[in-house]
């Protein structure tokens, strides 16, 4: 498979990435988990770039393809809430008293 890094850099939507890499996907899954798939994919790209500085563009694109496939597969069996990729899911709520913290008299 021959991919072009310049074409890759112009891609914007999740569907464009799947089409570029010719990966099959369920549009319903992408529609529901789009931001989460792209966030996971973006984090993977950063790791790939950091850990494979000597890799050729073709090798990196192959790794990117695998990363997109893995990011998608996570959300076939999991939900965005379970994955907690975004900061808002990791923040502890303020001014909340948990029921377990209420002492009974």
From Swiss-Prot:
Protein keywords: Nitrogen fixation
Induction trigger: By anaerobic conditions.
Domain of life (superkingdom): Bacteria
Keyword Amino-acid biosynthesis set for record: no
A Gene Ontology BP annotation from the UniProt entry: nitrogen fixation
Family matches, as InterPro entries: NifW
Keyword Iron assigned: no
A UniProt-annotated Pfam family: NifW
Membership in a protein family: Belongs to the NifW family.
Primary role: May protect the nitrogenase Fe-Mo protein from oxidative damage.
UniProt-listed NCBIfam families: PRK14102.1 (NF010702)
Name of the protein: Nitrogenase-stabilizing/protective protein NifW 2
Organism: Trichormus variabilis (strain ATCC 29413 / PCC 7937) (Anabaena variabilis)
Phylogenetic lineage: Bacteria, Bacillati, Cyanobacteriota, Cyanophyceae, Nostocales
Gene: nifW2
């Amino acid at each position: 498979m021959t991919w072009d890094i310049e074409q890759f850099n112009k891609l914007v939507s999740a569907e464009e990435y799947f089409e570029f890499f010719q990966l099959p996907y369920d549009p319903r899954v992408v529609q529901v988990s789009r931001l989460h798939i792209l966030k996971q994919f973006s984090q993977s790209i950063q790791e790939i770039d950091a850990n494979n500085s000597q890799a050729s563009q073709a090798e990196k694109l192959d790794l990117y393809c695998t990363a997109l496939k893995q990011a998608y597969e996570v959300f076939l069996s999991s939900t965005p809430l379970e994955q907690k990729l975004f900061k808002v899911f990791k923040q502890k709520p303020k001014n909340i008293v948990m029921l377990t913290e209420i002492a009974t008299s």
